[in-house]
Amino acid sequence: MFFLPLYDENPSKRPPIITWAFIFICFIVFMYQFNLPQRLEIGFVYKYAFIPDYLSNYYIVSNLAPINPLITLITSAFLHAGWMHILGNMLYLWIFGDNVEDSMGKFKFFIFYILCAISGSLLQYYSNPSSDIPIVGASGAIAGVLGSYLILYPKAN
């Protein structure tokens, strides 16, 4: 069964500025990407998505790729493959991110989110380092936020 949260019963004490900023940036990037002509959108995705094979061949690709493959470990988290992809990820971030940010503080949450995004990309890399399929989405970062929420608030509804 698919679990789709609509809210949680943990009010946050401070406005979740970083959570809102990540949501805003993801939607701005998605709207830009979504409104590109298909030919340009494909180029945009291949430029900013994480492609494991580019990291495997870093010394060859780093001078040829439009952007350093290490940077795409982060930039890929702000791209999404479609409406359901971004809406699902941002819904989970909206509901659970505020409490995690409240608990960690803004700066630590920012660093935590970016590290989770990088970790998600690296886990995908280690599962198939020769893949030339672009990896996009904030799912690695969202998984980190959800895991943190479960640890911080084990009895929350």
List PLM regions with ranges.
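A detector for small-residue-rich transmembrane helices and their helix-helix packing motifs
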Residues: M1-N157
